[in-house]
Amino acid sequence: MKPMTSSALRGFCRDRRGASAIEFALLAPLMLGLYIGCVEISEGIAADRKVTLTAGALANLSAQATTISIADMQNILAASTAIMSPYTGTTAAKVSCLKINADSVAKVTWGVASTGVTPRAEGDVVTIPVNLAVPNSSLIFSEVSYQYIPVTGFIPSFSRISNTGITLSDVMYMSPRITPPVYDTKACS
């Protein structure tokens, strides 16, 4: 191999033919990372919004009824799957009726949950916001949680989040529309 002459070295430094390829090689990983990050953030926000909509729908559908049969409640809980679409993971949903006593303590009078989820037990005390603790009243209380697993599970730096996912959850309180609903002979009063 011949030693490089000073004129050859100057010519090499002035040559700009590969500059675009080098710039692309440096910027492409950054641009790809930004794109994947934007997609993941928007997907996560959309999934969280679906969780909030599901909690609201469960409480709203339960608060509208005066009596709720077991079949009606199964349909209400099944609606959570439809609302969460296109997210196909397991949605854990609970609906409870809370009776608030004269001391503003909210206790569960009946509770149901989606398949594989333990409902709140009758008599459980539930902490509710102070402005909702109206003595001698009732509330419908829904809880929804969803395990969101990011699409970028194949990227090693995200493996800690990607393997376990992120738990998205929300709760909703609604006042019964007409009277506190009776669920399968269990009154909410």
Residue ranges and their predicted role:
Residues 1-83:
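Alpha-helical assembly-interface signal, strongest on the long, hydrophobic N-terminal helix that forms
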